[in-house]
Each structure stands twice: as C-alpha cells, then as structure tokens.
C-alpha cells in the first residue's frame, strides 16, 4: 500500500462583495428628486427588471410580463410633445454596456412618442430630467 501524500492546504482569498454602483447612484438620484421635485418624485418609478434571480423566480416573473430591456426609470409626465420619459440608468464607474434588448426597447419607446434615453450616472440623469421638466406640458387634444 502506498503512503498517503498530504497536499498543503491553501488559504482561500476572501471574495470581495460585489458593489452595486448602479443601484447606489440610482438611489442617490431618487433622493435628490425627492428633495428638489417632490411632485416628480410622486410620479417617477423604478422598473425592477434587472438583477440576478433564481431560475424559477425569473421564469415566473417572465410569465407575469417582465420583459428584457425595459429602462430602469419611468416618469409618466408628458412634456415637450412627449408622452413621458424613460431613463436607462448606468453607473459612472464601470458602467455596464447598453444591451441589444435595451437599445431595441429604447428605439421602440422613442418611436411611440416617449423620450427614452440612456443616462450615465446620477448627475447626467438629473441634468436630463431638469431639461425635460423645462419643456412645456404636452396638451392632449380632447
């Protein structure tokens, strides 16, 4: 019988927790909107499509209508001839690329009369929102 060969045990490096920069920046944006534009804060909402989910949960949500590519933030306030504003939010540091499904969705929304844009970070999104809010209200013909 051969003697057992003992291999040295290597200590595993502790894994660093992933940092959700996009989520943090978007939360900061929502805080600023709440402070500066309370009426807008009441209307704007986040579409929780992203994130990693268990396969069964993702399948269930897909059957309930979750679609890939829908922008992160929706503001259903009509301005400047647009019916509303959609923002695909990306972090300023290590931003994820705009996916083909996001590009296609943004194009479809723009074709339907919405202002759908990609914003890189909290400050970019705030500037775009300010510019949108300065546009005259879209009047609906009765």
Q: Which residues make up each language-model segment?
A:
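Catalytic phosphate/metal-binding cores of nucleic-acid and nucleotide-processing enzymes, i.e., regions
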Residues: 1-142
């Amino acid at each position: 019988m051969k003697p057992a060969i003992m291999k040295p045990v290597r200590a595993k490096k502790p894994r660093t927790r992933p940092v959700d920069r996009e989520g943090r920046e978007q939360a900061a944006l929502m805080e600023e909107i709440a402070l500066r534009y309370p009426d807008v804060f009441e209307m704007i909402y986040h579409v929780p499509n992203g994130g990693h989910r268990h396969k069964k949960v993702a399948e269930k949500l897909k059957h309930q209508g979750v679609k890939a590519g829908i922008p992160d933030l929706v503001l259903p306030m009509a301005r400047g001839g647009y019916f509303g504003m959609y923002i695909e939010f990306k972090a300023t540091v290590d931003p994820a690329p705009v996916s083909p499904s996001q590009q296609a969705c943004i194009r479809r929304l723009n074709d339907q009369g919405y202002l759908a844009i990609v914003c890189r970070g909290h400050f970019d999104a705030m500037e775009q929102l300010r510019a949108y809010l300065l546009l005259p209200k879209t009047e609906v013909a009765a």
